[in-house]
């Protein structure tokens, strides 16, 4: 039986990603979860992902590697730049939650909005989209929108307030070729924000589980 090791930073994502992944795969797998909220809270408070944070993430990833997992997945976009640095030192594939989303995000057009609740997520997501655009020979125009009050509601597990803040903000946005919801904790609003804005909306979990399934199929062959 294949096994997957997940690294989370947000409680609501940790609570739901496991079941979503099992349902999508359609076959039995072992899943090992590690939740480290410090790696989201500290960068959001300090405005940077420090060397100490990178070392902490490295230890988290190594700990999950020691479970014997076939695949490691990080479910927080704030971690992605550090994940890319750490990958060469890990024996198994490491997937970042926004890998697939960034690749798809550049296919709709050059005007992209990155919407987030945690400021620490914006820089990594914008950088990843820009790199994907450069590799495709495209120059993107990327705007950002951070709803900090929604992040406070998320930390308090007040999802009703979290959702209301984001939907109200979405109603004020201009038209974009694509809106990227930068955090997995926003994914359940994909259809509603799409309806409010009239724009294509991308979320990372759905695209990530597709990538996980494809990678597991490669490993099983």
Give short role names for the model-derived ranges.
Residues 1-221:
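Non-catalytic structural scaffold of enzyme domains
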């Amino acid at each position: 039986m294949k096994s997957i090791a997940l690294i989370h930073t947000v409680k609501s994502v940790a609570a739901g990603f496991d079941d979503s992944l099992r349902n999508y795969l359609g076959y039995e797998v072992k899943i090992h979860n590690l939740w480290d909220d410090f790696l989201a809270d500290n960068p959001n408070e300090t405005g940077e992902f420090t060397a100490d944070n990178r070392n902490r993430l490295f230890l988290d990833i190594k700990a999950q590697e020691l479970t014997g997992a076939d695949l490691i997945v990080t479910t927080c976009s704030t971690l992605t730049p550090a994940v890319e640095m750490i990958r060469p030192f890990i024996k198994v594939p490491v997937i970042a939650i926004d890998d697939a989303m960034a690749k798809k995000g550049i296919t709709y057009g050059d005007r992209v909005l990155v919407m987030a609740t945690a400021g620490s997520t914006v820089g990594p997501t914008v950088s990843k989209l820009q790199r994907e655009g450069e590799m495709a020979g495209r120059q993107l125009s990327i705007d950002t929108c951070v709803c900090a009050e929604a992040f406070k509601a998320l930390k308090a597990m007040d999802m009703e307030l979290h959702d209301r803040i984001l939907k109200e903000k979405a109603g004020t946005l201009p038209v974009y070729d694509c809106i990227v919801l930068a955090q997995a904790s926003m994914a359940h609003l994909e259809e509603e924000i799409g309806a409010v804005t009239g724009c294509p909306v991308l979320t990372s979990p759905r695209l990530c589980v597709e990538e996980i399934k494809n990678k597991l199929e490669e490993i099983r062959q």
